[in-house]
Amino acid sequence: MGRAVGIDLGTTNSVVSVLEGGEPVVIANSEGSRTTPSVVAFAKNGEVLVGQSAKNQAVTNVDRTIRSVKRHIGTDWSVAIDDKNYTAQEISARILMKLKRDAEAYLGEEVTDAVITVPAYFEDSQRQATKEAGQIAGLNVLRIVNEPTAAALAYGLEKGEQEQTILVFDLGGGTFDVSLLEIGDGVVEVRATSGDNELGGDDWDQRIVDWLVEKFQSSHGIDLTKDKMALQRLREAAEKAKIELSASQNANINLPYITVDADKNPLFLDENLSRAEFQRITQDLLDRTKTPFNQVIKDAGISVSEIDHVVLVGGSTRMPAVTDLVKELTGGREPNKGVNPDEVVAVGAALQAGVLRGEVKDVLLLDVTPLSLGIETKGGVMTKLIERNTTIPTKRSETFTTAEDNQPSVQIQVFQGEREIASANKLLGSFELGGIAPAPRGVPQIEVTFDIDANGIVHVTAKDKGTGKENTITIQDGSGLSQEEIDRMIKDAEAHAEEDKKRREEQEIRNNAESLVYQTHKFVEENDGKISEELKGKVEEAAKGVEETLKGEDIDAIKTAVDKLNTESQEMGRAIYEAEAAAGATQADAGAEGAADDNVVDAEVVDEDVSEEKKDGDK
C-alpha cells in the first residue's frame, strides 16, 4: 500500500506534506524549496516544465507559460498549445504530478493517496474539478478539505484538549476565505465560513502593474500592456516589490531595456513605490475582506470577544496592511505568529490524510458547505434544501408537486448560492424525472433529496412517490469532464510522465556531453606542452566527434562518442601523470644536490622562524 500525502494546491504556490512517525513533515521539492510555484510551461522543444523552472523562463516564453490556473478550475477554460487544448484540470494535474514525484523521491516509495485542499468558498464544480485533477495526476483523492479547516486542524491539535474558538483568515494568491471553527477534545468543527473566490495576492500584484504602466505611459507615451514580454517582466517585478514592501517602506522597481521608442532607442523603467502609495492603490481590495469577515461572525452567532485565537493563512497575509486590518476587525487581538502561513494548510491536509488512513486517532473533522443548495420552483424562485454552513456530510429531502394539470415530467434544476431568485445563483446541473402519472396539478408528490458527501460534492435524487420512478444526478456539469475524458487525460498524463522522464534523461546526457567537451578542451589547453601531438590529435578528434553527434537527435550516437572521448581522455591523463612523475623525480635529484648549499639552509631557518612568530602571534 502506497503512502498518503497532504497537498495544498495553491494559486501561486503549492506545498506537499506527509506524516513521518505521526508528525507532519513539509517535503522540499527537487530544487530544495518547501514551496513549488504553481506554474506550468511548455518549452519549444516539447519539454513540460513545472514549478521554479517554468517560472524562470516565463519572460521568454510568455504564450506557453500558464500561471494562476486555480482561478479557472471548474470552468470551461482551456489553453491551446501546439494545436492541443489543455483544461484547467490537466494543467493542475501537472503541478500535482511534480509534487507527487518530489514526495516519492523523499520517501523512497510510491505515493498513491492524497488529501487535497480547496478554498472554503469553492463551489461544487470547482471541488469536482480539483478531484479530477488529482485523478489525472494518478492520485486516489481521499478527501477534498477546505483550506481554513486544514489550517485549524494543524494549529488546533497542538493546543490540547481545551475547547477554543479559532478564526482563520486565509488570503492566498487567488482566493480569500474566512472561517470560524471550534476545536476541543479532538473535534474540529466549522461553525461558519465565507469568502471571495476572486480576491487574492494576484490582484495586489496587478495594481502595481497598472500603476507602473500608467507611470511609464505618462513619461514616454508608450503602453507596455501591448508588449507581452514587457508585461511579464512587470508582473514579476510587481510581485517582488509587493514582497519587499512587507519588510521595508520603499521598493525600487528598475527594469532596464523594457522597450524601445519610435527611433529604436532603448527605454528604461525606474520607479520608487512607497508602502503608503501601495496601500492607497490597493485599499479597495483590502476593504473587500471586511464583508466576509462580518458575515462569518454573524452566521456563527458569536461576538468578536469570544474568539480565542486568530490564525493567518496564505502568503498575502504577510502584508502589514492585512495584519493591521485583522487586528482592527478582531478588537486588537494579535494574530498567532507561530504558524507558517505558506505551509500550515498542507500540514493540516497531511494530518487529515493520517486520520482517513487510521494513522492519526481520536480526531474528528466536521466541515460545512459554504453556500446554500436548492432547486428552482414556480416563478423562478430558489427553494433552499440545504442552508449554508450546514455540517457535512448531510442529507435533506423535501416534497414538491406539479405546476400544471397532467404534467408528465418535471425538470429539476439544481442551484448553489444565496440569492432568492434561482437564475441569480450558480446553476450546478439539471435533470428530468419523467413518467409521472396524469393527475391534476398539486396531486403528484415528487420527493427531492440532496446528499452532500464529505468532499462537499453534491448528489441529487428525484422520486415520484406515486409510481416509484427515480432519477439521480451527481453534479459534474460544472467541471465539464465525463469519466471517459478523465480516463483519457489520466492515460495522457501517464504517457507524458514517461516521455518527460525520457526527455529529462536525454537532456542530462546532452548536458554531460557538452560539459565533457568543454572540460577536455580546457584540459588540453592547460597541459599543451605535456602531451604528444599524436595523443592531442586523438583527443581533439574524439571531442569533435561528440560535438558532431550533439547536432543530431541520436542519443545512442552521443553516448558512443562520449565513451570514446572518455577513453582518449584517460589515455591523456595517464600520459600527463607519467610526465609529471618523471619531472618530479628530476626535481628531487636537483634538490638533493642543492641541500649542501649553506645559503639555502639559512633561508629555510629564517622561514621557519617567521612562521613560528606568526604562530605565536596567532595564539
Curated annotation (Swiss-Prot):
Coiled coil: none
Compositional bias segments (type: Low complexity): 582-594
Induction of the gene: By stress conditions e.g. heat shock.
Chaperone is among the record's keywords: yes
Region (Disordered) location: 582-619
Compositionally biased region (Acidic residues): 595-611
Sorted UniProt keywords: ATP-binding, Chaperone, Nucleotide-binding, Phosphoprotein, Stress response
One GO MF term: unfolded protein binding
Residue positions where Phosphothreonine is found in the record: T175
Tree of life domain: Bacteria
InterPro entries tied to this protein: ATPase_NBD, Chaperone_DnaK, Heat_shock_70_CS, HSP70_C_sf, HSP70_peptide-bd_sf, Hsp_70_fam
SUPFAM superfamilies, per database record: Actin-like ATPase domain (SSF53067), Heat shock protein 70kD (HSP70), C-terminal subdomain (SSF100934), Heat shock protein 70kD (HSP70), peptide-binding domain (SSF100920)
Function according to Swiss-Prot or TrEMBL: Acts as a chaperone.
Similarity-based family: Belongs to the heat shock protein 70 family.
Cross-referenced PANTHER family: HEAT SHOCK PROTEIN 70KDA (PTHR19375)
Alphabetized HAMAP family for the sequence: DnaK
Protein name: Chaperone protein DnaK
Species of the source: Corynebacterium efficiens (strain DSM 44549 / YS-314 / AJ 12310 / JCM 11189 / NBRC 100395)
Gene responsible for this protein: dnaK
